[in-house]
């Protein structure tokens, strides 16, 4: 069994609205394969703005 790891830091606040849903898609062309997400991790930090501190 071959295992791959994908790790990417993306500043989502620059490209998506405040509320989003995340999905996955995979393909192997004409061949059949099972794609499984065995682990998922999400980390978010909310930075306070001057308006939210008031």
Swiss-Prot record:
Pfam families: Lectin_legB. Belongs to the leguminous lectin family. This is Lectin alpha chain. Tetramer of two alpha and two beta chains. It comes from Lathyrus tingitanus (Tangier pea). One of its GO terms (molecular function) is carbohydrate binding. The keyword Acetylation does not apply. Keywords: Lectin. It comes from the Eukaryota. InterPro entries: ConA-like_dom_sf, Lectin_LegA_CS, Legume_lectin_dom.
């Amino acid at each position: 069994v071959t295992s791959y790891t994908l790790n990417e830091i993306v500043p989502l606040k620059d490209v998506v609205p405040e509320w989003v849903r995340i999905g996955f898609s995979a393909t192997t062309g004409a061949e059949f394969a099972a794609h499984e997400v065995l682990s998922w991790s999400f980390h978010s930090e909310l930075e306070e703005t001057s308006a939210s501190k008031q």
